[in-house]
């Protein structure tokens, strides 16, 4: 499974599931640069180049892959000629974008702006060619939404810095970065690369496109809507200056969109860096003081992972990521007693597969064994609730192999479902092998397979 697929499936439970990279939307922002993986970067970014058949076919494939819209193809056959002419003439007007508020794991909401499928197609075509031109100039320490780069690489590089003796981290997150993007500053940066005024005007129109929610339209003078294929690339262009400044100062860092971890050798160096870099950043952006800190790496998380305190630090799954998986499992195993365990396992399977696929890098496996046991206990608890009456429980325990006396004693105890789900009688009656036959996967075994 590719990293973008794993992240999309894991968002609900991994700690990145706050809407920043929603399934079917953030994948569209990962730039596919051409057939075979490369685009001719020497082609200037003009409107005519953007709407060539080659680029449009690549963009179309990407949009459809990411759950674009089944009706796109017939619509294009009927209307593309007029849209194409409007693009060439420089007077194409993007449609309003749909607002979607996604709850953040730590409270509040993240606002997405979802363009129409046609505008996603056009944005993707622009992003493909623009990426081919600018990506080669980006920092090697920038990992978010770039061809051939992913979160796994960022986490592994962070681990190498820590093992190399940089055992303090300046964990810096920009506050409401996407909501506060200065349009003038971004367009100035883009004008250094894009000389075709039609393309620049179109990007500005996308930045200023109205947001619609509940039939109400909202105009915007700042910010960059998350949810379209252009947004991640534009964020990298805007934050490239920060990367270059950190490189100029000789710092070891990993940045993934607006999350930036800078690794230093001492608290003193970290205090000095935090003060100076905050002054640099806040000339144009704002540091999120609540989420930014100088700390030991094992006290923080980065892209859902953390590390152990050992000299040869090991990657582990951050506690918040574990807790969010548990929240997702709880939501699927409680509240609907009529749903069979088999159906519940079927609903759990894609969540568990996506989660462990993303967290395959963990070197601390004890938590996976604990989670496997906890998930089975949740399912035993579901069974106990579904059996409801002591008589039904007695019959089912007997059918599972318990003696009549033991089944009756167990069924008529005064303890609640959770206590019973962890008791010896339920563990003996509903063995681990039974869950395997129902299709439940083991996180521990899945992770071991990834390591083979």
Where on the chain are the PLM-derived regions?
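A conserved non-catalytic segment of reverse transcriptases
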Residues: 208, 279-353
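Extended C-terminal regions of large enzymes
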Residues: 387-452
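Short hydrophobic/aromatic beta-strand micro-patches
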Residues: 75, 115, 263-265
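Conserved polymerase palm-domain catalytic core
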Residues: 79-101, 105, 137-149, 153-301
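Non-catalytic, polymerase-adjacent accessory regions of viral genome-replication enzymes
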Residues: 1-78
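Short, solvent-exposed helix-loop connector elements
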Residues: 219-224, 313-314, 330-344, 354-367, ...
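A glycine-rich phosphate-binding loop feature that marks nucleotide/adenosyl-phosphate handling sites
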Residues: 292-300, 347-351, 368-376, 391-400
């Amino acid at each position: 499974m590719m990293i973008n697929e794993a992240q999309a499936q894991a968002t609900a439970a991994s700690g990145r599931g706050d809407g920043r990279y929603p399934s079917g939307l953030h994948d569209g922002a990962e730039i596919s640069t051409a057939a075979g993986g490369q685009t001719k970067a020497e082609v200037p970014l003009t409107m005519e180049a953007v709407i060539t058949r080659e680029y449009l076919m690549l963009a179309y494939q990407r949009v459809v892959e990411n759950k674009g819209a089944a009706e796109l193809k017939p619509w294009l056959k009927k209307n593309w000629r007029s849209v194409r002419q409007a693009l060439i003439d420089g007077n194409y007007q993007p449609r309003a974008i749909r607002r979607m508020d996604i709850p953040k794991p730590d409270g509040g909401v993240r606002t997405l702006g979802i363009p129409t499928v046609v505008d996603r197609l056009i944005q993707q075509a622009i992003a493909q060619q623009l990426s081919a031109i600018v990506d080669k100039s980006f920092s090697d320490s920038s990992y978010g939404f770039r061809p051939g780069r992913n979160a796994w690489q960022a986490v592994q590089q962070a681990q190498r810095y820590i093992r190399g003796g940089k055992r303090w981290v300046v964990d810096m997150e920009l506050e409401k970065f996407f909501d506060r993007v200065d349009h003038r500053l971004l367009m100035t940066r883009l004008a250094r690369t894009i000389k075709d005024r039609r393309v620049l005007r179109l990007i500005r129109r996308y930045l200023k496109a109205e947001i619609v929610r509940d039939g109400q339209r909202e105009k915007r003078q700042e910010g960059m809507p998350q949810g379209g294929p252009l947004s991640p690339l534009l964020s990298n262009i805007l934050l490239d200056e920060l990367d270059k400044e950190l490189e100029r100062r000789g710092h070891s860092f990993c940045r993934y969109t607006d999350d930036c971890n800078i690794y230093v050798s001492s608290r003193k160096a970290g205090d000095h860096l935090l003060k100076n870099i905050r002054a640099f950043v806040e000339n144009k952006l704002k540091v999120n003081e609540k989420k930014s800190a100088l700390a030991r790496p094992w006290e923080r998380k980065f892209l859902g992972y953390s590390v152990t305190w050992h000299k040869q630090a090991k990657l582990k799954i951050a506690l918040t990521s574990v807790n969010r998986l548990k929240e997702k499992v709880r939501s699927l195993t409680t509240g609907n007693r009529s749903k069979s365990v088999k159906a519940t396992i079927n609903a759990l399977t894609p969540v568990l597969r996506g989660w462990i696929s993303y967290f395959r890098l963990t070197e601390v496996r004890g938590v996976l064994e604990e989670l496997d046991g906890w998930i089975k206990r949740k399912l035993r608890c579901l069974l106990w609730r579904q059996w409801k009456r002591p008589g039904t429980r007695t019959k089912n325990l007997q059918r599972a192999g318990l003696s009549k006396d033991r089944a009756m004693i167990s069924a008529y105890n005064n303890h609640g479902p959770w206590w019973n789900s962890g008791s010896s009688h339920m563990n003996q009656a509903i063995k681990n092998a039974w869950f395997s036959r129902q299709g439940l996967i083991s996180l521990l075994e899945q992770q071991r397979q990834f390591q083979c």
